[in-house]
């Protein structure tokens, strides 16, 4: 599927997994009452706890319950995989991630006494009986075991019960290639979309949401959240990464989201280029010159816009536990 968003080239997979070492796994819970799940992003194949990554976060609108942001803000590092799930499952998924990291430490010969799992959420209660908290340790471990560079998008994992612009949302991903000083780097974005209202949906400058709205007669406030995970192999500091990930908001705005009161827009980014050992003295890091950062800004904006669209186009129609139906964008629009 070629959406032809922007002007920058994308990677071979056109996903966050174009960043070497990054893998994504899902576990979907899909039965009569539950349309939910968990998605886990593994930033590397080695030990991220003992060799951390530069990281940053940005909250555009803070109506959310994401866990793990405070330490990223203070230390500027990521030390665990990143999990995505529904709002009421954050606690159980966080506990599962702690257990996973403790087991990884034991397997590698060290004890974990403090760890900072990052667990992001959106509220899928319109389709999922969220009170049951159907995602636990077994589902988290299954998602991790299923992690691959080639992963499904749409209504899978954490995206199973999500709604985007009053249509079916979910998991989407895209990437862009950035050339600096003769070297080619990758910026990848993965989104969990659960935001926006149909009336505002705009693609390529055309407000297609109005036409779709006349056919399905549904429009609700812009609320519900969007999680944006940015992975890159650009050699950047935590501060530079923070500047880059803030441009995810451009991609959301180009599709018509105005970031409503009840919507939680959270961005988390990591770079695989520099690793930070758990113990050490003085460290030497390579980072791009600020004069070259504009291309990274454009890359993350384009990749976010495309990732959101992919989350909708790859999703199938889903009927929730109360009978509510979320239609797929693909029923009304194709690139």
Task: List where the protein language model places each region.
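Alpha/propeptide regions of enzymes that mature by internal proteolysis
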Residues: 1-335
